[in-house]
């Protein structure tokens, strides 16, 4: 197993490095004519191209259509503004939208008349006149210089040195004349008689004539289709006046040169989704047949089988990814002992894990990880497989990203050569039209997984790349509100500024201003722009309205509306502040009330705790009083029974005549036995009188019992009570001690009322003027 590529890490963070998208490549043939270039792109469409203000402006040769997107770039519109102008004005008329493929060729194409009007409307007609007014002639343009190609990766060169297999590759530098190209075409036509036509012949013939040109990343981040795949019709340079027919030739041993060089360079450009491989598969369908073991068998005459080794492993794996076969190569299912899963399989340094992650093939990812593939391995740009997986929409289309992220999540904190994190690449995906949903899907998956690790998330979510950009600033430039909201909800800082001294907050406000009131350009048109200033941003503000009436409506009317809305906002804000103050005062009063209630509750609790022993004593006193009453009643009852028995005995003695000596007692008994005279009524009246007297005596007896019990309860405190009576009498002045008990209730009520008045006056003094207390 080869060494794992070196990694760069965030400070204090293990396993960290992050990557930038590799620049797209395109096979083209360029001929200079004055300041114009005649260009063939991977689609085979010839165009005239002129660089103006660092923008490649194109005009198709076949129908003279102009690229409206490029015209707006020259006019100084940024991406959000271009999108709005295209939707409002350009796309309502005749137009053709080109998406996919080489980045510069993409955009909205319009007839030359509409393109001229658009250039005039936004003040760039003069500087675009050369490409608009150019008339093709029969004179052949001078030969174009060859475009240099980035050398193969270091790992690839080292492997070639070790195996001693040095490939013979055509020269990548130096001019090539048209005559030389014609001679090469004649040589190819001569070879046609000795070979069988094959769809892959364009690989060899085109490799001998045309070089790859890496496109600067600033122009487009959209990967191109495999650039080396060209049809016969694509290769007919007769369309350029070169009279060069490119026939097919048989794929022979020269395929060894092409397969390891051109094919790997072209295959290194990953597709945004697998459907973009269709053109490659249709051309390569007959040139490579997959055996049950996943090894390509090239069709040719008398080709001896080659030994299988590490060099062939990379070819087999790469062929698997760029073909439509669904059978996984056997070297991935059962890896040989000399199989290195971290070996790069193309000239951009991508490993098999990079390809599998980018294409959303989770099963292959698991096989590679089992074989020892490193999730921290980086390509030439130090991009990790996780970064490559979020640069395309394949994982979104197949809804495989959560499962894939669980396998790769330990590389979340990695950074690449541009100091970009995986969040930068997700936000960068949102810049591509139609990819916002995929970017949101990736972002929400990662943020949900990292929500339990806020410290680590805070370290990486606000990380700045070499341009000072954070993921939030890129998302704000992409005008993706969902991405912006997701990042803000998880702690992204909108005030971090990039090298242009602009923050995400600035981009958001700029977008809102653009939506509400676009800034028109002055009526005076555009001044001359010097050559040195051509590379800088235009010094004028682009016009968004063609007519004067539209400019007036979009100017003064919007200003008046804005002024009224601001006045309404200020009025509403002032009223809201007043309401807020009232609410604060009410809350303060409520807090005071709650405080008083709490304090009173505590006082009641304290008094209750203090009175608890008194309650026990009260119960004890009541128990003693009840016991005393019972004893007194029992004593009285016993005395009554004794008296009654004595009376009965005395009456019995009287009847027996034993009271002879005691006349007084005898007279008393006789009086009791005498019946009143006067009839029955007198007797009943006498009985009623006696009953009443008995009842009165009983009540009086009960009263005396109560007094006796109270006297017993107050026993020992009578002297103290007497002193209290004297003290109260002296305080009242003129009230005798005997009247104190009768006035006690009135005195108590007066004291309670006076206490209540003092409490009220105290609270009023705290919340109002002192005169209220007085």
Curated annotation (Swiss-Prot):
Region (Disordered): 135-180, 209-229, 752-774
SUPFAM superfamilies, alphabetized: Ankyrin repeat, DNA-binding domain of Mlu1-box binding protein MBP1
Expression triggers: Expression is regulated in response to flucytosine in a TCO2/HOG1-dependent manner. Basal expression is positively regulates by HOB1.
Entry's Gene Ontology BP terms: melanin biosynthetic process; steroid metabolic process
UniProtKB keywords: ANK repeat, DNA-binding, Lipid metabolism, Melanin biosynthesis, Nucleus, Repeat, Steroid metabolism, Sterol metabolism, Stress response, Transcription, Transcription regulation, Virulence
Composition skew (Basic and acidic residues), residue ranges: 155-165
Domain HTH APSES-type: residue ranges: 37-143
Main localization (coarse): nucleus
UniProt cross-references to Gene3D superfamilies, sorted A to Z: Ankyrin repeat-containing domain, Transcription regulator HTH, APSES-type DNA-binding domain
Disruption phenotype annotation: Exhibits increased susceptibility to flucytosine. Also leads to hypersusceptibility to SDS. Reduces LAC1 induction mediated by nutrient starvation and leads to weakly reduced melanin production. Expression is significantly reduced by nutrient starvation.
Keyword Transcription on entry: yes
InterPro entries noted in UniProt: Ankyrin_rpt, Ankyrin_rpt-contain_sf, HTH_APSES_sf, KilA/APSES_HTH, SWI6-like, Tscrpt_reg_HTH_APSES-type
PROSITE patterns membership: ANK_REP_REGION, ANK_REPEAT, HTH_APSES
Residue spans binding DNA: 68-89
PANTHER family from the UniProt entry: ASPARAGINASE (PTHR43828), TRANSCRIPTION FACTOR MBP1 (PTHR43828:SF15)
Protein name: Transcription factor MBS1
Gene designation: MBS1
């Amino acid at each position: 197993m080869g060494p794992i590529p070196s990694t760069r890490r965030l400070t204090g963070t293990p396993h960290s490095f992050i990557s930038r998208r590799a620049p797209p490549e395109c096979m083209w043939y360029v001929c200079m004519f004055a300041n114009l270039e005649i260009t063939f792109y991977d689609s085979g469409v010839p165009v005239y191209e002129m660089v103006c203000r660092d923008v490649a402006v194109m005009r198709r040769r076949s129908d003279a259509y102009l690229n409206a997107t490029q015209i707006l770039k020259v006019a100084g519109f940024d991406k959000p503004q271009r999108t709005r102008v295209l939707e409002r004005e350009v796309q309502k008329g005749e137009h053709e939208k080109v998406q996919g493929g080489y980045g510069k060729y993409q955009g909205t194409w319009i007839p030359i008349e509409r393109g001229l009007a658009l250039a005039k409307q936004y003040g760039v007609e003069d500087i675009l006149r050369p490409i608009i007014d150019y008339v093709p002639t029969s004179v052949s343009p001078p030969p174009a210089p060859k475009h240099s190609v980035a050398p193969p990766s270091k790992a690839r060169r080292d492997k070639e040195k070790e195996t001693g297999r040095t490939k013979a590759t055509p020269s990548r530098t130096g001019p090539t004349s048209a005559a030389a190209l014609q001679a090469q075409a004649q040589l190819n036509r001569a070879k046609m008689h000795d070979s069988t036509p094959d769809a892959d012949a364009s690989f060899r013939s085109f490799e001998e004539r045309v070089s790859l040109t890496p496109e600067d990343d600033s122009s487009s981040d959209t990967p191109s289709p495999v650039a080396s795949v060209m049809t016969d019709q694509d290769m007919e340079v007769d369309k350029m006046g070169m009279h060069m027919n490119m026939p097919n030739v048989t794929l022979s041993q020269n395929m060894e040169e092409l397969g390891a060089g051109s094919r790997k360079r072209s295959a290194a450009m990953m597709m945004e989704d697998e459907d973009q491989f269709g053109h490659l598969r249709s051309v390569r369908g007959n040139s490579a047949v997959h055996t049950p073991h996943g090894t390509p068998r090239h069709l040719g005459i008398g080709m001896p089988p080659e030994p299988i080794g590490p060099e062939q492993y990379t070819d087999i794996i790469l062929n698997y990814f760029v073909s439509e076969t669904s059978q996984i190569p056997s070297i991935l299912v059962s890896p040989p002992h000399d199989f290195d899963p971290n070996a790069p399989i193309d000239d951009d340094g991508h490993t098999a894990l990079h390809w599998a992650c980018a294409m959303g093939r989770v099963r292959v990812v698991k096989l590679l990880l089992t074989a020892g593939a490193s999730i921290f391995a980086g390509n030439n740009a130090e991009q990790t497989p996780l970064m490559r997986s979020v640069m395309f929409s394949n994982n979104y289309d197949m809804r495989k990203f959560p499962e894939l992220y669980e396998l790769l999540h330990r590389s979340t904190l990695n950074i690449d050569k541009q100091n970009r994190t995986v969040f930068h690449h997700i936000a960068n995906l949102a810049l591509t039209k139609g990819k916002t949903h995929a970017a949101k899907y990736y972002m929400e998956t990662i943020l949900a997984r990292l929500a339990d690790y806020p410290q680590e998330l805070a370290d990486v979510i606000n990380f700045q790349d070499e341009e000072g950009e954070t993921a939030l600033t890129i998302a704000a430039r992409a005008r993706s509100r969902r991405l912006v909201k997701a990042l803000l909800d998880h702690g992204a800082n909108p005030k971090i500024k990039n090298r242009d001294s602009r923050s995400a907050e600035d981009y958001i406000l700029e977008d809102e201003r653009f939506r509400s009131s676009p800034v028109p350009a002055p009526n005076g048109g555009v001044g001359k722009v010097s050559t040195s200033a051509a590379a800088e941003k235009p010094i004028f503000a682009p016009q968004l309205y063609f007519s004067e009436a539209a400019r007036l409506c979009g100017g003064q009317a919007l200003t008046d509306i804005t002024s009224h809305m601001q006045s309404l906002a200020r009025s509403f804000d002032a009223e809201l502040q007043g309401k807020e103050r009232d609410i604060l005062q009410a809350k303060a009063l409520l807090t005071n009330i709650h405080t008083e209630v709490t304090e009173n509750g505590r006082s009641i609790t304290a008094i209750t705790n203090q009175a608890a022993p008194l309650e026990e004593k009260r119960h004890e006193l009541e128990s003693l009083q009840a016991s005393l009453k019972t004893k007194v009643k029992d004593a009285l009852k016993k005395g009554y029974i004794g008296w009654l028995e004595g009376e009965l005995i005395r009456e019995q003695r009287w009847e027996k005549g034993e009271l002879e000596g005691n006349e007084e007692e005898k007279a008393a008994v006789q009086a009791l036995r005498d019946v009143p005279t006067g009839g029955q009524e007198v007797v009943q009246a006498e009985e009623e009188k006696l009953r009443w007297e008995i009842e009165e005596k009983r009540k009086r007896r009960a009263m005396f019992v109560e007094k006796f019990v109270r006297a017993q309860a107050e026993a020992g405190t009578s002297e103290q009570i007497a002193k209290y009576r004297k003290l109260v009498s002296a305080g009242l002045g003129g009230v005798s001690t005997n009247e104190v008990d009768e006035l006690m209730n009135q005195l108590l009520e007066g004291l309670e009322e006076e206490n209540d008045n003092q409490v009220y006056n105290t609270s009023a003094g705290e919340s109002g003027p002192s005169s209220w207390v007085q």
